[in-house]
């Protein structure tokens, strides 16, 4: 190895995320001065099988949410293990950290410590190789810009309103380029604002930049979005498709084994009834994707959903798979879902994230690279989406710099790729 790509210094610090909570940022410097920096996101609705985000628990600092322990793990333990190692060997770097941690869920050093370092090492190695990150990770075949899943209305755990589902998204599949898709999304977002104003509804934005108006039902959320699409001069179905993130674990009553929909007068649904509820929505509206339609432990319900809708629409497992290879392979062998949400901090290292994406592709599952509700200005996920030709990205609405930063980076990448850039639009859903 050229010793120039040896890791010389690793420095972590506590910074702020988009919700005013502390998070971990890591700098990595190689022997030749190559530099990489990464900041770690965090989620609001967290799956019970996710890698552990280490928080200090000291109530006198940041309400217990400080990350000084994780920072210290990077500066001492991780630095000690990685100093002098070759930054180009990502798999080895990640494995050394996993071995030093020694737990299944990264609970000892913290997934936030490990991930921050993992991504910063990759960025330093890319700088050393004089390549943009997407090219360094993905090689010469990395050229597909993702279809954005833009979360423009929030409900559920992300909002204080009478809407059960956590996210209502638009997917500009009729665009010819990412640049055009972004413009369509922005125009629809502004149209939606005026539709909501016209109905005297709140237009303040939530954690991910979407609106959280006090709508009366799930269907009303869909209807106002369709109005906004048309008002912006686009055609639902032809130009723009819809997506839902039900995040149904949040309205699942474990003791009753029922799904309780507040927007339907607190009616209780069995798994089969909820599947029928979705099927009815899909037959009425141009919905192409539903995420976390059933609780993460309701495998029978998931099987039913997959049998009923799996050939028609994309069924994304988020809490179901938590970007975890073991959970995903169980899903694949049981014929559950047909798509996986990829959140780097759910698994906690770059190489494991890439393995999950690879496994999903081999099984003809689509990949959706995703942000978290607590974000920073870090744009690594834009590069991961292009590097892996994932085809889809979920990184919020059309406001708030923590979201827009990702879109802006994709604009730059598309420009840099020039004529070789691909935007597949509707064909992204190749497995339907």
Swiss-Prot record:
Chain sites annotated for binding (2R)-2-phosphoglycerate: 166, 343, 372-373, 394
Designated gene of the protein: eno
Protein's UniProt name: Enolase
Cofactor(s) demanded: Mg(2+)
GTP-binding among keywords: no
Family the entry assigns: Belongs to the enolase family.
A GO biological-process term: glycolytic process
Uppermost EC category: lyase
Keyword annotations of the record: Cytoplasm, Glycolysis, Lyase, Magnesium, Metal-binding, Secreted
Cross-referenced SMART domains: Enolase_C, Enolase_N
Described function: Catalyzes the reversible conversion of 2-phosphoglycerate (2-PG) into phosphoenolpyruvate (PEP). It is essential for the degradation of carbohydrates via glycolysis.
GO terms, molecular function: magnesium ion binding; phosphopyruvate hydratase activity
Superkingdom as given in the UniProt entry: Bacteria
Record: residues binding Mg(2+): 245, 291, 318
Cofactor note: Binds a second Mg(2+) ion via substrate during catalysis.
InterPro entries the UniProt entry points to: Enolase (IPR000941), Enolase-like_C_sf (IPR036849), Enolase-like_N (IPR029017), Enolase_C (IPR020810), Enolase_CS (IPR020809), Enolase_N (IPR020811)
